[in-house]
Amino acid sequence: MEWIDPYLGYDIQVSVNSKKVVDELLERRICGVAHGKAEFGPRALGNRSLLGDPRYDIKDTVNTIKRRQKFRPFAPAILEEYKDEYFEGPMNEYMQFVAKAKHDHSSVTHVDGTARVQVVKKDCGSIIRPILEEWYERTGCPMLLNTSLNLTSYFDFILYM
């Protein structure tokens, strides 16, 4: 059996308007994105993700939405061409390594200043790439908070949106 990619399941093919997603993020809202096939594994890679503005402390809001403990870490999704400006150490598109943040980004790093960085390549094929490009164009920030879109219920998601 050959491993093709980290995606499986139902393939959601809906139009995602990157501009509208970024409009919501700029209002300091947390945005849910569901597009393409679901990721298989422990990390959100952009096809089933909650996204947030990493420039502000939004951890408590996301923890409330997800009903999870405060100590649980978040991760940044960053445009590949900017990863070395913000982090040092091994990084890849599957968040398999821990990198050290070069600057304070407390919304997307652990208490020790490290993060499991998702490097978003130009050819990744995920909706997260055009969202990040729009985000960078409008803010100058090449990353977003990215956590898995696994909520207790549909109501929780609507309640906090």
Question: Language model features by range: what are they?
Answer:
Residues 1-161:
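Flexible beta->alpha loop and helix N-cap segments adjacent to enzyme active/binding sites
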